[in-house]
Amino acid sequence: MKWDEIGKNIAKEIEKEILPYFGRKDKSYVVGTSPSGDETEIFDKISEDIALKYLKSLNVNIVSEELGVIDNSSEWTVVIDPIDGSFNFINGIPFFAFCFGVFKNNEPYYGLTYEFLTKSFYEAYKGKGAYLNGRKIKVKDFNPNNIVISYYPSKKIDLEKLRNKVKRVRIFGAFGLEMCYVAKGTLDAVFDVRPKVRAVDIASSYIICKEAGALITDENGDELKFDLNATDRLNIIVANSKEMLDIILDLL
């Protein structure tokens, strides 16, 4: 199967159908609750239905933020977040994406994260590098004098101490897409140790970051392990280097 073609076709159809809802609270409404307890807005449901239209005929396992798990006993599992950054989307904040991760026998195989408003396709096949619209990308070199990170506040970390270690702290509100910003060298790191992140948030960008040279660990600095479901919450650190990772771990 040509997973890149499938993912891009889904992304472009979702884009066509949901962008009229961007920033339009008056047009959106809640249609249900996801397996993890989050409210499902109509644009989430529209996006998921489009993805399912493509995927169900393939008879693969499916994990989706809104639906949960469809187990077809396949060697292939597709993990999707129809809209990464739903809060941003409905509030008119231009930072949200479609996430499409493919696993073979539970191992990362292909990842696609599509940033709608910049029309940016981040993607990677295992062992073949990471790309942004066909251009190869990699994490930037560590520079202690110019560290820019995205961080989700936690009582585990002293924010003032963190600010003394880095030049800029940002919170963008779409973790999977933020991971891609590490992969392309815009951010040095993104991390969340509350824990709040789920597999659906990171499945597509995980392989993109790994192929771009990023380190992805848990709060102890061990390589991140996660199950392919829509409910488990994770602590995750994504860093461009061992030096950056050590700075974050020293704060925990």
Curated annotation (Swiss-Prot):
GO terms for molecular function: fructose 1,6-bisphosphate 1-phosphatase activity; inositol monophosphate 1-phosphatase activity; metal ion binding. Mg(2+) 1 binds at residues 65, 81, 83. It catalyses: beta-D-fructose 1,6-bisphosphate + H2O = beta-D-fructose 6-phosphate + phosphate; a myo-inositol phosphate + H2O = myo-inositol + phosphate. Gene3D superfamilies: 3.40.190.80, Fructose-1,6-Bisphosphatase, subunit A, domain 1. Disulfide bonds: none annotated. Its EC number is 3.1.3.11, 3.1.3.25. IMPase activity is inhibited by Ca(2+) and Zn(2+). In contrast to mammalian I-1-P phosphatases, is not inhibited by Li(+) up to 100 mM. Keywords: Carbohydrate metabolism, Hydrolase, Magnesium, Metal-binding. The keyword Magnesium applies. Mg(2+) 2 binds at residues 81, 84, 201. Substrate binds at residues 84-86, 170, 175, 194. PROSITE patterns: IMP_1, IMP_2. Is thermostable. After incubation at 85 degrees Celsius for 30 minutes, more than 95% of I-1-Pase activity remains. Its cofactor is Mg(2+). One of its GO terms (biological process) is signal transduction. Pfam families: Inositol_P. Phosphatase with broad specificity; it can dephosphorylate fructose 1,6-bisphosphate, both D and L isomers of inositol-1-phosphate (I-1-P), 2'-AMP, pNPP, beta-glycerol phosphate, and alpha-D-glucose-1-phosphate. Cannot hydrolyze glucose-6-phosphate, fructose-6-phosphate, NAD(+) or 5'-AMP. May be involved in the biosynthesis of a unique osmolyte, di-myo-inositol 1,1-phosphate. Homodimer. PANTHER family: INOSITOL MONOPHOSPHATASE, INOSITOL-1-MONOPHOSPHATASE-RELATED. Belongs to the inositol monophosphatase superfamily. FBPase class 4 family. This is Fructose-1,6-bisphosphatase/inositol-1-monophosphatase. It comes from Methanocaldococcus jannaschii (strain ATCC 43067 / DSM 2661 / JAL-1 / JCM 10045 / NBRC 100440) (Methanococcus jannaschii). The gene is suhB.
